[in-house]
């Protein structure tokens, strides 16, 4: 996960009203912090928005539109649900299937949504994997009608929901005249402008091999910083570790040479989706993907051997006690 080092000093806080709120939504702990005259009001509105989006997109809430869609195999989506499905299907194409919202039946076979973790048998996995292909999701963006080609298919927008939510929170902050803000949605960090004193926010990037320590710190303004790694959620069975980032190619936890991927972008939704996608791709494909889309995002890749790769767009803003290699276009 990425975490912010909160360094706004007391004198800055006097000039700017600070308001902060902690909440639990989307299966994670979140902290929203804003500075400005209407900070408290903005933070309260933002928290309401987060909870509304959670209720809309949750796969486990019987009243959510995604739950209903998964039950019925078809639906007319809300504007936001439709937008997210559209973005997800676009990412599916661009990442050549690495980002796949239809992987949900496979996630269930592993017990990740319910935390009833177990390694599925080969037959179950084969059966679920046959359903897991976003190519078989038919979505019409004009009518917002969606249907699945196979009855037992299910989707999960969890791979981009938090990134989208953080962008929406930023919109609320801007509408309420907030001059400076930082939010952490379960380690997804997004910032508005710099800190109240005008300096950069400093976002620490967690060490996947030793959570609680960091591989380095990013100095940023107005960016989303989102990290994915197998260390975030996993279980052990028969001495083996299985993490929650499933490779749609084989239905098993991705094991393609990376232990964590951090994405830095203006677009929270994109950053969220790509952090998972590049993790699944592995180091070579991930670097190639960045080179082809370097105008959209930057990245920090941590390989299985602990070596760190940083794309050149953020190399000057990343400080680390470890050596790192700069990925050039």
Each PLM stretch: what is its role?
Residues 1-329:
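Mature catalytic core of soluble alpha/beta enzymes
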């Amino acid at each position: 996960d990425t975490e912010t080092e909160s360094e706004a000093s007391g004198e800055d806080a006097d000039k700017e009203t600070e308001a902060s709120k902690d909440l639990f939504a989307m299966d994670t702990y979140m902290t929203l912090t804003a500075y400005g005259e209407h900070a408290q009001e903005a933070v309260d509105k933002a928290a309401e928005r987060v909870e509304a989006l959670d209720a809309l997109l949750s796969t486990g809430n019987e009243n959510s539109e995604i739950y209903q869609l998964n039950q019925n195999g078809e639906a007319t989506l809300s504007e936001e649900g439709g937008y997210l499905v559209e973005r997800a299907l676009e990412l599916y194409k661009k990442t050549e299937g690495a980002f796949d919202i239809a992987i949900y039946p496979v996630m269930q076979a592993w017990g990740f949504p319910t935390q009833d973790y177990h390694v599925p048998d080969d037959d179950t996995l084969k059966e679920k994997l046959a359903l897991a292909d976003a190519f078989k999701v038919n979505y019409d963006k004009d009518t917002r009608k969606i249907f699945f080609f196979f009855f037992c298919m299910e989707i999960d927008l969890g791979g981009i929901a938090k990134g989208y939510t953080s962008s929406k929170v930023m919109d609320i902050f801007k509408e309420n005249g907030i001059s400076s803000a930082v939010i952490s949605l379960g380690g997804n960090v997004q910032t508005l402008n710099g800190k109240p004193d005008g300096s950069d926010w400093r976002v620490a990037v967690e060490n996947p091999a030793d959570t609680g320590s960091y591989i380095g710190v990013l100095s940023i303004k107005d960016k989303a910083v989102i990290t994915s790694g197998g260390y975030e959620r996993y279980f052990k069975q028969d001495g083996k570790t299985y993490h929650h980032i499933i490779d749609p190619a084989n239905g098993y936890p991705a094991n393609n040479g990376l232990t964590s991927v951090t994405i830095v972008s203006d677009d929270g939704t994109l950053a969220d989706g790509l952090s998972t996608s590049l993790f699944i791709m592995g180091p070579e494909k991930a670097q190639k993907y960045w080179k082809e889309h370097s105008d959209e995002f930057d990245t920090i890749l941590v390989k299985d051997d602990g070596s760190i790769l940083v794309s050149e767009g953020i190399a000057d803003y990343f400080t680390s006690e470890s050596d790192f290699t700069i990925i050039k276009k």
